[in-house]
Amino acid sequence: MENQKQYPMTQEGFEKLERELEELKTVKRPEVVEKIKVARSFGDLSENSEYDAAKDEQGFIEQDIQRIEHMLRNALIIEDTGDNNVVKIGKTVTFVELPGDEEESYQIVGSAESDAFNGKISNESPMAKALIGKGLDDEVRVPLPNGGEMNVKIVNIQ
């Protein structure tokens, strides 16, 4: 049997995916079925753009359902051990870019729940990879997309 990729995530991320799946199954799926039904009532399906659009939407919804079900089946829930000495998935890390004193904070989460606009970065991102395993007051070199790097100092882990 082939090893399935595991999806590390927080309990909060797991529950969010469960809610998203429920919405897809109980709201979005029935809505698109109704759209298909209405579009069929227009007659000839060969040139029925409403029907084609609804079928496309149905395909996307079914893909999303399968993707989320797969991630939930293979989820690896990251438990908070209470250890705030080392950066790991689930922890919120505060650091300052050196030289400087302006603080930035990010929670490191699994890729399935990353949302940079809300301060959640994927454990697979260059920033998270550089920070994971490091400790309080450590100075860390973080690779940048342009090939450069920035130096940061970890000032808080929670």
From Swiss-Prot:
Alphabetic keyword roster: Coiled coil, DNA-binding, Transcription, Transcription regulation
Keyword NAD among UniProt keywords: no
Family that this chain belongs to: Belongs to the GreA/GreB family.
Function according to Swiss-Prot or TrEMBL: Necessary for efficient RNA polymerase transcription elongation past template-encoded arresting sites. The arresting sites in DNA have the property of trapping a certain fraction of elongating RNA polymerases that pass through, resulting in locked ternary complexes. Cleavage of the nascent transcript by cleavage factors such as GreA or GreB allows the resumption of elongation from the new 3'terminus. GreA releases sequences of 2 to 3 nucleotides.
Organism of derivation: Staphylococcus aureus (strain NCTC 8325 / PS 47)
Protein name: Transcription elongation factor GreA
GO molecular function, one term: DNA binding
NCBIfam families named among the record's database cross-references: greA, PRK00226.1-2, PRK00226.1-4
Signal peptide interval: none
InterPro entries: GreA/GreB_C_sf, TF_GreA/GreB_CS, Tscrpt_elong_fac_GreA, Tscrpt_elong_fac_GreA/B, Tscrpt_elong_fac_GreA/B_C, Tscrpt_elong_fac_GreA/B_fam, Tscrpt_elong_fac_GreA/B_N, Tscrpt_elong_fac_GreA/B_N_sf
Pfam families in alphabetical order: GreA_GreB, GreA_GreB_N
Coiled-coil parts of chain: 4-70
